[in-house]
Amino acid sequence: MKKKIAIFHPWIKSRGGAEKTVLELLKNFKGSELYTWVYEKDNTFEEFKKYKINVIGNNFFRRFSHSNILRGLFLISSFSSKIPLEKYDLFLISTSGVGEFILFKNYKPGKTYAYVHTPLRDADKDIINWNLKNKHRNIISKTIYLLAVNVYK
């Protein structure tokens, strides 16, 4: 019997390796459904249009999906992002730092799995130092940035 899988990927908004991986999962696990906080169909692979994509969460936070600092606000959106897991045999989460927030309202004991496509680059010490020196020069920007990346230490 085929397993029905719910796949969560935080944002489908570009044409990268993580999006290709999600597409391969959808191709190989027929009948699976994708859940995401952000889906920008014109900015990602055309193939996504073949699959059922459920955009969940609060619309307000979607405008922050392109800001590395403010993506942490999706933590708040996690509290209202409910996936009907009773319809699925497995729940697969793609994460690199914020995807696991979806677990606040969604967990299927023994049936929830997460994979990391790439570590959260913004939590790397060298990248933090570079960002503080080159991107976040004023005190307000530095403070917000440090608060955001401190979550991952």
Feature-to-residue mapping (PLM):
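Acceptor-binding helix/loop patch of EC 2.4 sugar-transfer enzymes
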Residues: Y51-N54, N59-S65, P109-Y152
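Active-site donor-binding segments of glycosyltransferases and PAPS-dependent sulfotransferases
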Residues: E33-F101
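Short, well-ordered alpha-helical microsegments
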Residues: R15, V22, V98-I102
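Short amphipathic alpha-helix
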Residues: A18-F29
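Nucleotide-activated donor-dependent transferases that construct or modify glycoconjugates
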Residues: K2-R15, W37-Y39
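Short aromatic-enriched loop/helix-cap "lid" or pocket-rim segments at secondary-structure transitions
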Residues: E19-K20, T44-K49, F104-K105, D124-I128
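Short, solvent-exposed loop/turn segments at secondary-structure junctions
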Residues: I12-K13, N28, Y39-D42, S96-G99, ...
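Hydrophobic/aromatic residues located in beta-strands of well-ordered beta-sheets
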Residues: I5, S32-L34, T112
